[in-house]
Structure formats: structure tokens, C-alpha cells
Amino acid sequence: GSTFWPSPQQRWSWPPVPELDSDAYTAQVEGDSLVCSSKPGVRAKVSVVKRVRASVAGDVELEYSLKNEDTVPASWAPWEITRVAAGGLSFFMSGERVVNAQLPVMNQGGATWYKHDGRNVGSGQKLTADAAAGFLAHVAGRTLFVKQFMDVPLAQQAPAPEAEIAIYAAAGYVELEPQGPYSQLAPGASVTWRVLWHLSQVPQDIQIEVGSAQLLELARRLTAP
């Protein structure tokens, strides 16, 4: 499944803010989009609107609006968390810094690669890092899932231990977690952030392995303007 949280997490600690994460959203259809709206959070004084539509190309477009429901200015970044099944290979283009390096990743071909093995992650480990391009990809079997988003410069990322990219691994699943720009919102103001989901079958002649230049090229083609 997939959810949305406000970043940084240290502002609301744990567990996730229920109004944004697990409580029911109100939903309505507007044109070709499904629009889902949360209640205002209590521990994080924000609300979220999710606008979802399928594009002509067959991709899924997700537009998130994060609104400051507080009476004072507050700084937040949008944060999408998508859980995929155990196993698989995750990768993104390596950026300027790694913030949290708990996962055993490999750096090859200008990219950071994580091959999930549920036996080696204990109770959960995380990587947070900058990316050099606005995508985060994951291969399961021969299906490639790519999230595309605006690349966020270091100066616009949420404070450490947050970062533009996070990969969280537990024994039974992996989380793919991009974040948008960190900005101050006046009371009642909103910020909008867009993520595209692409799916593609990996051709049989492409090896699914750490460092695969062909996999990187396929992800680049899917996210090309």
C-alpha cells in the first residue's frame, strides 16, 4: 500500500498521525481524478488532499496538497511512503550526500543499489540520501516500478535525518520514500507536490542485477520529459 506523511518525522514522532495515515479520507470524483481529503491532524497540524488520475500514457499521476492548519507559520515537506513486497532491487541516482546509512547498499554506475534480503535487516533499517535525479525505482520479478518527482536541491530538503530519498527495509517488506521540498507555510497556506508512477516489464535481454546500465537506461527513458 501507499500513504503520505508530513516531514520531518521528529515533529510528530511515532506512530503516524492517524488523520493523515489510517483514518478514512472523504472521496469524490472531479473530472478524470479521484480526490481524497483528510481531516486536520492533531499531532501534526496539517491536512492533506490527494488527487489521483491515470494518464493517457497509462501512468498514475498523484498530486498531494499539504495545508498548514495551525495558527502560526510551520515548515513541512511532503513525503510519500509506498510499501512493496519482500525481495527485489531498489535503485536511484547517487546524489551529493548520504544522511543515514543503515542499509547495505552498493554504489555502481553512478547509482545507489539496495537488494532486499529480509534475513539481514533485523527490526528495520533505513537509508536516507540525496539523489542526483528525480526518480526512485524498484524491480520485482521482471516488473519495474519507477516513482518520478521533482529533484530537490540539498538546500531545499528537510533537516537531517530526513533527505530527498529514503528506503526502509523490514523482514517482510520495503518502503520507497521520496520527499518533496521543505518550505515554510503561512497559516492556511498549502504546498502542492506531484509524483508519477510508471510501470514497465523489463525485457528478457536485460539482466536484473546491481549496477545494470540497461536498467538505469530503462528508468531514465520512463522518466524522460
Predicted regions and their residues:
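Surface-exposed acidic/polar loop and edge beta-strand patches at domain peripheries
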Residues: G1-E61, E69-P225
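Beta-strand-loop-alpha "switch" segments that mediate conformational coupling across diverse proteins
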Residues: Y64
